[in-house]
Amino acid sequence: MVWSKAKGCYVVVSELAKQNGKNKYGQTGDTTGLLSALLCALMLTGSALFWPMEVSAGTQYGDGTWADGYNTAIGIAATARGDGALALGTQTKATSIRSTAIGHQAEASGADSISIGTLSGASNTHSIAIGDKARAYGIDAIAFGASANATATNSMAVGRNARSTAGGSVAVGINTEVTQINSVAMGATAKAYGDSAVSLGVDVVSRGHSAVAVGANADALA
């Protein structure tokens, strides 16, 4: 191997080759030339072959947006962090793996969480909040409706101002409220204040363990 001023790199020279470029049989060194060209190419491009690929930046659109990795942020000051996160809307934030936030100032901060609606928030794993100011704070919690709140594990609040604040509780209807575990309140302004209690109907209230109140204005105390 010798340095070639013409090629600007090292070249391979056959032991059979002479200075005039011919071997003892009078044939030109075509093979030597091919090897030289190959060596030059490897020297010039070898570093590129082993250079680590840069991970593509996230997709972002709008003033002040931020998206890294495989995330997407669309809207003024929208932020998407994690992996597979989507933030869509002004000042919207999706900050955990596979989280989705859609709407003005909506925020999804739990893994696989979904927050849709103005000022909505889903802050725990698999939590879902849909509706303006809806809040789902518990694991697997679901809040559906304007200002609905589901704050405990496996809790569900469906309806405007519905509140479910205990594990496994369900509140369905406008202004319904459930405060103890495994309880159910269904109907406008229905309330369930005891554990494992059931309230069904308008303005129904159940109080105490396993209390059941059914029908308009019913009140059950166990």
Spell out what each predicted region is.
Residues M1-A57:
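Cleavable N-terminal targeting peptides that direct proteins into the secretory/outer-membrane pathway or into
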Residues E54-A222:
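Periodic small-residue-enriched repeat registers in elongated scaffold domains
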